[in-house]
């Protein structure tokens, strides 16, 4: 019975540590940082460089608001002006409505030409779009 408890505890710890942060990769597959499930954004050295709050606020490393993601996918700058939008299919548009890329369901991030510019697997599409297109933390 004790061995079973230890085994279950080990599995729970492995699952919890895997769910804590997802690696963000550039087009060559190299890690350019991590986004934790609580929204903390870390650079490739592991230092906190910002965060996505649960209300959509995007903060820099000093905690100042630098933008916001609305519930409809609109991305705003610190002044509240719309700078883009993430549509439900992952298409990313700039403030004029032109497509500038896409975040696919598997986390692949593509530019407007369809070329892969990175990977953000297991991360909210809106967070990935903000990270790669509007607020480059890497």
What are these regions (language model features)?
Residues 2-48, 54-65, 71-83, 88-138:
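Long terminal segments
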């Amino acid at each position: 019975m004790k061995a079973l408890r230890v085994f279950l505890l080990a599995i729970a710890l492995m699952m919890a540590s895997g769910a804590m942060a997802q690696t963000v990769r550039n087009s060559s597959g190299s890690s350019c940082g991590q986004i934790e499930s609580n929204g903390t954004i870390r650079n490739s050295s592991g230092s906190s460089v910002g965060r996505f709050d649960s209300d959509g606020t995007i903060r820099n490393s000093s905690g100042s608001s630098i933008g916001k993601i609305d519930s409809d996918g609109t991305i705003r700058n610190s002044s509240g002006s719309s700078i883009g939008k993430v549509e439900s299919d992952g298409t990313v548009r700039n403030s004029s409505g032109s497509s500038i890329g896409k975040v696919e369901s598997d986390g692949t991030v593509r530019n407007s030409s369809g070329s892969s510019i990175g990977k953000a697997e297991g991360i909210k599409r809106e967070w990935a779009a903000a990270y790669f297109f509007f607020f480059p933390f890497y």
